[in-house]
Amino acid sequence: MHLFLTFVVYQFKRNAAIFLSLCIIGLVIFSIVFYRDPQRSVPIGENIIISPADGKVVSIDSVKGGEIPFTIKNGEIIYLPELKGIIEGNFTMVSIFMGPFDVHVNRAPISGNVIDIIYIEGGHFPAFGNVFTENERNIVVIDGNVRTVTVQIAGTVARRIDCFVNEDQTLEIGDKIGRIKLGSQVVVMYPSDSSTIVKIGDKVKAGETIIAQI
């Protein structure tokens, strides 16, 4: 009986050690894949707008001046009322879904000056007797040849957005502006008189794919 119990304990410890080792290896591989930041070949040109994110184009919408823009993330409508005073005239809004295997570093869609950064913490808030959920998001407004608005959208619980830039900072097209740590979506807005090149379903790369021509 003693030998049997000793054997059981040995096997448990051995399997637990193997399981723990596999978990550690998996975590290391996940971290390497998720936090990778490869070099990008940024296209040259003053009259182009490039993708701020890796991922898939899930929607292309028109926003009229004075309207409250919104996007849809995982079937949920996310209103962006903070943009109402920022965008003037008619804008095109391209939404890009970032999957778990996409690079999660975001880049400037144009060259210009950062004129505004707006951070919305997100979380769960009481409203009209119910709990209202608001997604964490960070908004970077860049003025260059045109004005672009890049919205990084994360989840509703933990802080998951890192912003790499500051207001009044001058950026070159393709410069890194931030990172979203977990499953996420990025929206880029630009004047509607620009010519949109991408279409819904296209795969795009941050800092490389041209999404519109000014």
Report residues per predicted region.
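Contiguous, well-folded functional domains in the mature portion of proteins
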Residues: 1-214
